[in-house]
Regions:
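Conserved acidic residues
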Residues: 47, 104-105, 234, 334
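Terminal amphipathic helices with adjacent charged low-complexity linkers/tails
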Residues: 2-18, 129-174
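Active-site diphosphate/adenylate-binding microenvironment
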Residues: 181-303
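Glycine-rich, anion-gripping cofactor-binding loops and their flanking helix/strand elements
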Residues: 35-38, 48-145, 253-292, 296-302, ...
Length: 337
């Protein structure tokens, strides 16, 4: 049987070697205190966690510890979270899905640009939103949205939950989470069934997969590339194409494995320089290792294995980046179009 406390201890033991900040590590590593905090932070609000582009590992850990539904974009680095909800855009856009209308608070990690339902959620006037901003650049300016900006995990937990002594009506956190998990599993099963029918068509199949409105082929392709990256321990770079939305719909969630790192130029350069970005990610495995006896620089390390997933237009827009001279370091790059 699944033991959330045992899982929490195991994850906390691995936190020290992760990319979490010292404050985030302290919040997770002190497992006993974290579990004791949960007795105080009994949810009195129907809170969800949005992990957008660049959100980071802590978004998944935060949602897991507090048993909150997690809406994680493919490039959030939180898609693998135990509470990551597949097909969250579809659930949010479904006017008949009651839990979507019942959301009271949102904790936001990262930069949301991928999903219109997420944008609509963050613009709702009946919802309080908090943005996690532990490290701010010197040029940082808050946006126009009326978000509460918080910099510590403890503040986030206080925002997402409330003291049981002060709450008039408590929310059963497992019940709130399950209200999202079960419908999401049904949509996931439906999606996987459509993919299986596409990949292994029967004689009676009459579905027109050439219809641009039918994204089954794209979802099948994106899911396979994602799973290959997981199995081969490759990093991923995602182009700003329909395929990234196909991946958002078809990529595994609810605790299933994800690639070690997933990058995207969301909200930065569109399709400009996507292949160059993937090359740069791969070349980041090299590092200067001093000089030789002739005072020439020595390079250490090796190219990181990277898979780029993009559409045909994104590929054509930056194909010249593949014109690499043999006098330069070469990437370990696989391009899936």
């Amino acid at each position: 049987d699944y033991d959330p406390q045992a899982e929490g201890r195991a994850r906390a033991a691995r936190a020290e070697g992760s990319g979490l900040s010292s404050a985030e590590q302290r919040w997770l590593l002190d497992s006993l205190e974290a579990q004791a905090d949960l007795a105080e932070f009994t949810p009195a609000h129907r809170t969800v966690v949005v992990a957008a582009d660049g959100a980071g590992e802590f978004a998944a850990e935060f949602a897991r510890v507090l048993n909150l539904p997690l809406f994680a974009e493919p490039s959030s680095e939180a898609r693998h979270g135990a509470t990551s909800i597949p097909h969250y855009p579809q659930l949010l856009a479904d006017g008949s899905f009651a839990p979507a209308a019942q959301i009271e608070r949102v904790v936001l990690f990262g930069h949301p640009t991928l999903s219109r339902p997420i944008t609509a959620l963050l613009e709702r006037e009946d919802i309080q939103c908090a943005f996690y901003a532990p490290r701010r650049a010197s040029w940082y300016e808050p946006g126009a949205r009326s978000f509460v900006e918080l910099s510590t995990p403890h503040e986030l937990a206080e925002f997402a939950c409330a003291s049981s002594a002060a709450a008039d009506e408590l929310v059963d956190e497992l019940s709130w989470l399950e209200q999202w998990v079960e419908p999401a599993r049904e949509l996931q099963d439906e999606c996987l069934g459509a993919i299986a029918a596409y990949e292994h068509p029967g004689a009676e199949s009459s579905v027109d997969y050439t219809d641009y409105r039918n994204r089954t082929a794209g979802r099948s392709y994106a899911r396979r590339v994602w799973q290959d990256a997981v199995a081969q321990r490759r990093l991923m770079v995602l182009g700003s194409s329909n395929l990234v939305r196909d991946l958002d719909a078809a990529a595994p969630a609810l605790g299933e494995s994800a690639p070690a790192r997933v990058f995207a130029n969301r909200g930065l350069a569109g399709i400009d320089g996507t292949i160059a970005t993937a090359i740069g990610v791969s070349l980041s495995g090299y590092y200067p290792a001093g000089v030789d006896e002739n005072s020439r620089p020595v390079i250490g390390g090796a190219a990181l294995p990277v898979t780029l997933l993009c559409g045909d237009l994104t590929f054509q827009h930056d194909v010249s980046s593949l014109n690499l001279p043999n006098t330069e370091l070469l990437p370990e790059l696989r391009v899936e179009v």
